[in-house]
Amino acid sequence: MKENTHPNYREVVFQDMSSDFSFVTRSTIQTKESIVWKDGKEYPLAKIEVSSESHPFYTGTQKIMDTAGRVEKFRQKFGSKAGKAAK
């Protein structure tokens, strides 16, 4: 087998920037930053914007879109021309 053809698979700390939540997992991501974890070891640090700790679907703060407002806005803008043509 050829040497150095596969990326380095190692433990990496992922830090959610919006909720300040961090976790260690294995990844091939390349990072320039590192952090000392709770166990005293130094790991590469990958900063992410959203994780399961901050995503609305997982936190239960998901908002449902109100599409009725869009339909009413469309009807006000274009009227009911489509309804007249169908008759």
From Swiss-Prot:
It comes from the Bacteria. Part of the 50S ribosomal subunit. Belongs to the bacterial ribosomal protein bL31 family. Type B subfamily. Gene3D superfamilies: Ribosomal protein L31. One of its GO terms (biological process) is translation. The keyword Secreted does not apply. This is Large ribosomal subunit protein bL31B. It holds the Pfam family Ribosomal_L31. GO terms for cellular component: ribonucleoprotein complex; ribosome. InterPro entries: Ribosomal_bL28/bL31-like_sf, Ribosomal_bL31, Ribosomal_bL31_B, Ribosomal_bL31_sf. The keyword Ribosomal protein applies. One of its GO terms (molecular function) is structural constituent of ribosome. Keywords: Ribonucleoprotein, Ribosomal protein.
